[in-house]
Amino acid sequence: MTRFQFHRIAAAVCLSSVLLAASVQAADPIRIGVPVGLSGANSVVAPSVVQSAQLAVEEINAAGGILGRKVELEVADDGSGAVGAQKAFDSLIFQKKVNVLISMETSAARNAGLPILARGKVPYIYTSFYEGRSCSPWMYVNAWVPEQQVPPIVDHFMKDKAAKTFFLVGSDYAFGRGMLEFTKKYAEGKGAKVVGEEYLPMDGSDWTAVISKIRAAKPDALITSTAGGAPNVTLTKQLRAAGINIPYGNLAVDEGTAKAMGADAQGIYISASYVTGIDSPKNRQFLAAMGKKFGADLKTPNDLSVPQYEAVYAYKAAVEKAGSTDAAKVVSALSTVSVEGPRGTIAMSKERHAPLTMYLGQVQADGGVKVISSFKDVDPGAQCPNLK
């Protein structure tokens, strides 16, 4: 063999190795991590969140994936709390090697996971409504904050129900206290008076003492902010059993949870960025696809599961704009992309948060939500001014 032939063969072998490596890399799936409360306070709503993510991934793969790569879901139960979230984040980021985290979680779970997120340097799209002002260079939020959700309920109670006094009830953690802190400030700024404010632990289920205080205070209206679906169920059931029938706004009930609550949920006022009754081609298409995929096992799409569906598409758009799954490039691209989803056009363009159309509604006997009024493109306000 001549030296020339040797070099040609060596070059061919090297080229083949490079092409093979590139082919293998291109075939590697993109992994989306979903840490979510399949147990604990969020167990009522978490299955609907997983279903929405499953549909989005199925649709994307059927259309060719992302940059030609198949997408896979990795779901981890965070137990709806801090300890479980630390385990779930660590497992997904460092063992499963996910490219992104996309999920709805309690604020306790989110806050516990953020330091692990920073260490792993993985993009995170948080899809749960929350108390606001949680900021990380790696996190975006496509759900509502108090500035978007609270005013429609308080304004309606004061204007249409002549409410002058409010009683506030929440779970004793970041979401419960953060939401009601904003509610109190907003209501008092409008001239109302808060005559009581009570909290139970996240896993609290006996509201007897709180209900006694509500009776004694005789408020014109009640607003609650509890942790996930389970506390909503117990609190509302006990309120109804006690005969508390004043105007009742719940800052943590979604349409899916309302259906699970049965007759007890009837009459509750909610403020949400999604209701199944949104009359748009995208929403009708989404609901039809969910029904076709899950049939009798379908969990009612809601204000926690629909942002999950849209977030998967937002990640797809960011990766395609960045031209790769490189974490820093994707994080940079996320603020510049928008998606057309069941809620309309969603862009996380305002300090890592999204302007949203909000719907004030009241739960009906069948668990559905009757829309009273809507508010287009409500600004999230100043959430993370140091992050653009």
Model-derived features: where do they sit?
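Extracytosolic ligand-binding ectodomains
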Residues: 2-5, 9-16, 26-388
